[in-house]
Amino acid sequence: MSKALTIGQVAATSGVSTHTLRYYEQAGLLRSIGRTDAGHRLYAPGDLDWLQFVMRLKATGMPIAGMQAFAALRAEGDATFGARRAMLIEHRDAVLARIAELQTNLDAISDKIAFYEAAEREASTG
């Protein structure tokens, strides 16, 4: 994709509402969004890549404040690579802990399903 997209096209492509796109821009998560002479937003391919990453952070539970801090570091340039890496390591560790917790809960649910299956088999053979 080499040409800029309107906010409606980005919403349709990304599944993110136009309201959310405007909010993300206002919150500082999407910066330097281009504008037409009439003031309509124009998103570059790099903006869509960044939006996808922001949505991954959101989907994995990073709070808006964390995403804002990461976006602010990103806006400062390459000198913040270390700080951004540290933030992502911390977030990854939190995601891994959540996955482990979910796996433990899933295992307990699977055990209960197996219990009921065995109980039903035993009851039917009587």
Kindly give the residue locations of the regions a language model identified.
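Basic helix-turn-helix/winged-helix DNA-binding cores
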Residues: 1-69
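C-terminal regulatory/oligomerization modules of transcriptional regulators
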Residues: 1-2, 76-126
